[in-house]
Amino acid sequence: MTQKEIWYETLHANFGQYFSVENVLYREKTEHQDLVIFENPVLGRVMALDGVVQTTERDEFIYHEMMTHVPLLAHGQAKKVLIIGGGDGAMLREVSRHQGVEQITMVEIDAGVVEFCRQYLPNHNAGAYDDPRFKLVIDDGVNFVNQTDEKFDVIISDCTDPIGPGESLFTSAFYEGCARCLNEGGIFVAQNGVCFLQQDEAVNSHTRLSQYFKDVSFYQAAIPTYYGGIMTFAWASQDPALRQLDLTTLQHRFHQSGLNCRYYNPAIHAGSFALPQYLLDALNVSR
């Protein structure tokens, strides 16, 4: 890959997107993944794994704010948070903004991701790797949740698409393990693709999660980087009330948190659970 070259995403066979490349900062094929970071004049630094864009400097805040602040503020008193994946450090960055959180454990299958993101995506982690509450575990996510004796208040699965190394993080074995190691009142969330184009992912996740959680749904956010625009996040807990908090409660918790966000706010939080009819029909549920 050379300067000014065009990089094509390969997630979809019949359509997709491209990025002009100003400079390739890093590329290495590790045991688990083909990693590349390059600079784009509009989106800043772009990270891709196995031909699929994972994050860009320009809009990563949308994804990471919604993946963290929605479950943490819905919980209200989270002390221990588990992040599966998230090697770029941005999920850790957002979780660490919650002063009430006492321990943040991140399980990443590939140590190489963490090391090169420290160097090449410094704005993503913003020094969060040095937070004394942070503990890094290099392990497979499925193995960890099924072997650990620890319990967590919130689990965030910052997984790749269900192909390659990320496939196991969409299985019943993983969801069962997550349900097992959540404290009472705990919440599980996971990225679930762009449902307009990857609807089967949401349907499969809904079916599998429903085996272990009483309340399973999804929420959404508009993230330009991901082709199709509207990213879907899986939500699972044993208490439907956590998903149905009134706006006044969310506003109070947000104010108390001291957070200053660029995308998330209490109204976005409440509205994000309103799902399009085509997804409700596919899930065979009513709202």
Swiss-Prot record:
Subcellular localization(s) per the UniProt record: Cytoplasm
Family: Belongs to the spermidine/spermine synthase family.
Encoding gene, per UniProt annotation: speE
Classification via Pfam families: Spermine_synt_N (PF17284), Spermine_synth (PF01564)
Keyword Ribosomal protein listed: no
Protein name, as recorded: Polyamine aminopropyltransferase
Record keywords: Cytoplasm, Polyamine biosynthesis, Spermidine biosynthesis, Transferase
An example Gene Ontology molecular-function term: spermidine synthase activity
